[in-house]
């Protein structure tokens, strides 16, 4: 109960009215006020922009689990086959839904006042790890960021481990009480040369797992959201005891992302 505040507390007003009618001196504390909870959060969103994100959300396979060829010529053929990029598109791609989700989460975080960065990643062999900035952690939102979102396009393969480690270095410079890495992907980690002979898929998964453990050791909480319907097969290993969610309907990503962020950070 407050003597001054934003709005009347209807229960207190009724009680005061009853007191007056019965000859009792009413309380002057008739108001209430919303107390804003001080948040100290920094979060990086990592978007997978591998070639598979060029797929239509209607025609995407139940699993984005492919064998990435190590031969350079075969690798480029593989990348081109995954992109399927035509001049005119009449369908929505996975990457288009990722962009929509980015716009919505930006709107939510601008209202919350949390520190946040949005980056996208891919890979083209060990010497060509791709990491691009959509919005840096220290950057104020501006029209240039909207332009960067528009220009995001499917690239190569899914080299997660190095992208996560680079993100750790970015968050290490921020002294927020709560720090998070939010990984958004459509498939398992894989890339040309992202392997040891005979254990290609396992090596990529375990390297990513180790990168996530390194994040936790720095006080950073990782979370993975995937639209790969068979994601449980490898995420149980890759995420260890970290949280993840497999989204069965890709079109729900823009609505689900802010909900998960709220649950994760409160």
PLM region spans:
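Intrinsically disordered, low-complexity acidic Ser/Thr-rich regulatory segments
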Residues: 76-101
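Short secondary-structure boundary/capping segments
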Residues: 59-64, 132-138, 195-202, 238-243
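Von Willebrand factor
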Residues: 129, 133-179, 189, 226-229, ...
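An active-site-proximal "capping" alpha-helix that borders the catalytic cofactor pocket
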Residues: 96-113, 118
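C-terminal helix of von Willebrand factor
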Residues: 242-266
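VWA/integrin I-like adhesion module and closely mimicked acidic/polar interface patches used
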Residues: 151-157, 168, 187-236, 247
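Negatively charged sequence features
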Residues: 1-68, 74-76, 80-81, 115, ...
């Amino acid at each position: 109960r407050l003597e001054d505040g934003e709005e009347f507390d209807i229960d207190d007003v009724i009680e005061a009215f009853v007191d007056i009618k019965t000859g009792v001196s009413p309380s002057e504390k008739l108001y209430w006020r919303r107390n804003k909870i001080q948040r100290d959060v920094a979060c990086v969103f990592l978007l997978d922009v591998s070639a598979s994100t060029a797929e239509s959300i209607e025609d995407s396979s139940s699993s984005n689990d492919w064998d990435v060829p190590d031969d350079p010529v075969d690798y480029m053929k593989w990348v081109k086959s995954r992109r399927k990029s035509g001049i005119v598109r009449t369908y929505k791609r996975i990457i288009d839904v990722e962009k929509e989700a980015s716009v919505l989460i930006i709107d939510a975080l601008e209202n919350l006042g949390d520190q946040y960065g949005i980056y996208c990643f891919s890979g083209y062999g060990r010497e060509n790890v791709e990491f691009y900035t959509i919005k840096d952690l220290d950057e104020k939102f501006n029209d240039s960021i909207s332009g960067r979102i528009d220009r995001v396009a499917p690239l190569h393969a899914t080299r997660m481990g190095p992208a996560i480690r680079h993100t750790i270095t970015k968050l290490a410079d921020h002294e927020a009480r709560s720090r998070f890495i939010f990984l958004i992907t459509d498939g398992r980690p894989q890339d040309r040369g992202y392997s040891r002979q005979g254990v290609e898929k396992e090596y990529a998964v375990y390297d990513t797992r180790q990168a996530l453990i390194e994040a936790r050791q720095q006080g950073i909480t990782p979370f993975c959201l995937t639209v790969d319907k068979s994601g449980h097969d490898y995420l149980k290993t890759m995420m260890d005891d970290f949280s993840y969610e497999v989204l069965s309907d890709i079109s729900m990503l823009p609505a689900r992302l802010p909900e998960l962020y709220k649950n994760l950070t409160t």
